[in-house]
Amino acid sequence: MRIEEIAAAGSPKSKMIYHENPEMLHVNTLARHSYFIPFAKGQDPFAKREESKSLELLNGDWSFRYFDSILDLEDDFLQVESEKTIPVPSNWQLYGYDKPQYTNVAYPIVFDPPFVPDDDPVGIYSRDYSYVKDGKDRILVFEGVDSCFYLYINDAFAGYSQVSHAISEFDITGFLKEGENKITVAVLKWCDGTYLEDQDK
């Protein structure tokens, strides 16, 4: 599906429709490939990936807002700032939000695939990103998000992905402007993939 089709009239919240659609696992993600980190000529290719000039880690404290239900999310949630932060990567359950769960046999939600309950918890993560045009593409890489997420760059929808324990990559170059940019990620606790990923989590 093209991004232009998703950018039709309606609030960002009203467009959050992919997490209950088994035919829409990914939107605007790059094709799957072997994982690698580019190293410049002269760099030690066996060094830690953090030493690559082509890698910029966005780990650290992100602005964070939590909602017990997706229904509680404001229509204009992209415009609402938060004074609270949370470390990334982490589990929000370890920071006073929601509650941990271990599922071994029973589903954590009422069995009604591909639908999930209305009280689907949502976490809104946001941070600034400084960009200088240098002719290089900017590929935003998520190394695992449970259970799905919607990505926004400068309040514009940039993509969607699920499959909790897999890498999702987005070419966000075309969404960036010179200077400061805002990255926002809306993470949902449950999606249609929960019916496949529920056990031993």
Regions found by a protein language model. Give the residues of each.
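Predominantly extracellular/luminal regions of secreted and cell-surface proteins
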Residues: 63-100
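Short secondary-structure boundary/capping segments within folded domains
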Residues: 54-55, 77
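Mature N-terminal segment immediately following signal peptide/propeptide cleavage
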Residues: 55-65
